[in-house]
């Protein structure tokens, strides 16, 4: 298994290099530059021009890329021109919020999707199966932002059960009250992300269970008199869980991508909301850093999926 992990980590190096090139040229293709926002009716154009020259914006592109790459490797992704803080400092603060919300969302996703899949597969063609298939189809067809707006309108404004922004209540004092206040604030966005996260897992897991039930080893076990519950728990569920195990890493990175809409609509100060405000404020340093981070997390999710598959499937380790 360690050979699999080491091989995948080594493959990530050229992938990260290609990703950095794409991110750098994406930033170059964007209109304006980091100093365009400083231009105003009372701004001296010569001062802005001096800042551009000092930042090396007129150097050859390969010099700019190597300088940017070297700084990125050392953890220096520049300054946020809107927030007037180092990019890594801002991302570090926001990443904590997104991490905990995504973690809660992943937990809720699997708590919802796995029982739904088992009930639907065990009752194929019956009303239980049709109920969850209908739920899955409706959820797949609803635009996420419409669902988010509906949820926040019902539970945030109409019923006033949950807060509609922030991460903690102003009156929360002490470790325990702050902890529960943070969970309380992330319930709505995490639940909303989990609803859409169940779609893929439900489809994979239900199909996997139905497929495993028709395999020869299941018929052999039944012919030998093995109890149906034992066959289902020890054999069918274990083999059917391989697809969702391999999908685990992509679920995490997918939630981070989906958090862009969720955090913006729910007013949750995480990386997704930061990305939207950076685009509207043309904060180029922050935008490139967040794109690079999201790409890295995508590669990390693929690595995590491979590691999980190597752990649960002996055939991967042998290969």
Swiss-Prot record:
- Segments passing through the bilayer: 9-29, 99-119, 137-157, 183-203, 248-268, 289-309
Q: Which UniProt keywords apply?
A: Cell membrane, Membrane, Peptide transport, Protein transport, Transmembrane, Transmembrane helix, Transport
CDD domains tied to this protein: TM_PBP2 (cd06261)
Similarity section: Belongs to the binding-protein-dependent transport system permease family. OppBC subfamily.
This protein's name: Oligopeptide transport system permease protein OppB
Kindly state the subunit structure of this protein. The complex is composed of two ATP-binding proteins (OppD and OppF), two transmembrane proteins (OppB and OppC) and a solute-binding protein (OppA).
Q: Which GO terms describe its biological process?
A: peptide transport; protein transport; transmembrane transport
Q: What does this protein do?
A: Part of the ABC transporter complex OppABCDF involved in the uptake of oligopeptides. Probably responsible for the translocation of the substrate across the membrane. Essential for uptake of peptides larger than three amino acids and for growth in milk.
List localization entries: Cell membrane
**Domain ABC transmembrane type-1 residues, every copy:** 95-305
